[in-house]
């Protein structure tokens, strides 16, 4: 017997996930994806009764479930008491949530964003979205612009590669010597993040991929 999967909240990534699961033969329902055309939309109580719940990435933002595709708000404290301990719960960026949910509600929330392949795949639309914002904010093309990427994590790597493909002059800053060695090996100008200062004014566009400088 097939288990019911409920995709609850999130953005167009979750809409696409629901469609893929349907195509693979799963019994799928959705809630909170109405503005994105989420398939098989059902009332919240019905969605929360599914054996498997897939929650957004990140699960919560500002104290509530991440719900950019609906006008309905759902506070996290309204959600957790309505779930069962025997449900399989999947969500993204759950490290701060998981211990408290187990302690307070007996729930186990697994973090699909712990998987490296998910983080790398997520870096692609993030990097391309950043480039789109830069294009919209500048009056000239990015070709030949001096671009600085701060940080050489997953997003920084993809971003530098995409910018190179657009013909920009790419510099990348990182804290670790090993990262700066790789930056230079790939043909970008390496800079030390902790030494960025007056030279920031030399760049036409700056992309920051680190949480804090």
Regions from the PLM with identified roles:
Residues 1-5:
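Extreme N-terminal starter segment of soluble prokaryotic enzymes
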Residues 55-144:
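Glycine/serine-rich phosphate-binding loop and adjoining beta1-alpha1 elements at the start
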Residues 58-62, 74-86, 186-213:
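Rossmann-like adenosine-cofactor binding region
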């Amino acid at each position: 017997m097939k288990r019911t999967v409920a995709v609850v909240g999130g953005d167009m990534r979750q809409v696409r996930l629901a469609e893929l699961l349907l195509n693979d033969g799963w019994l799928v329902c959705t809630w909170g994806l109405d503005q994105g055309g989420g398939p098989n939309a059902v009332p919240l109580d019905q969605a929360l009764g599914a054996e498997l719940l897939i929650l957004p990435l990140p699960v919560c933002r500002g104290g509530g479930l991440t719900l950019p595709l609906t006008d309905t708000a759902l506070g996290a404290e309204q959600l957790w008491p309505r779930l069962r301990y025997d449900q399989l719960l999947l969500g993204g960026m759950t490290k701060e949530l998981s211990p408290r949910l187990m302690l307070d509600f007996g729930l186990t929330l697994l973090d699909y964003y712990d998987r490296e392949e998910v983080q790398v795949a997520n870096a692609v639309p993030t990097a391309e979205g950043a480039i789109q914002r830069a294009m919209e904010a500048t009056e000239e093309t990015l070709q030949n612009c001096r671009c600085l990427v701060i940080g050489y994590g997953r997003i920084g790597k993809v971003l530098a590669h995409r910018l190179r493909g657009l013909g920009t002059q790419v510099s990348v800053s990182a804290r670790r010597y090993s990262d700066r060695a790789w930056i230079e090996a790939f043909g970008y100008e390496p800079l030390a993040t902790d030494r960025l200062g007056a030279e920031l004014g030399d760049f036409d566009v700056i992309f920051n991929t680190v949480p804090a400088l």
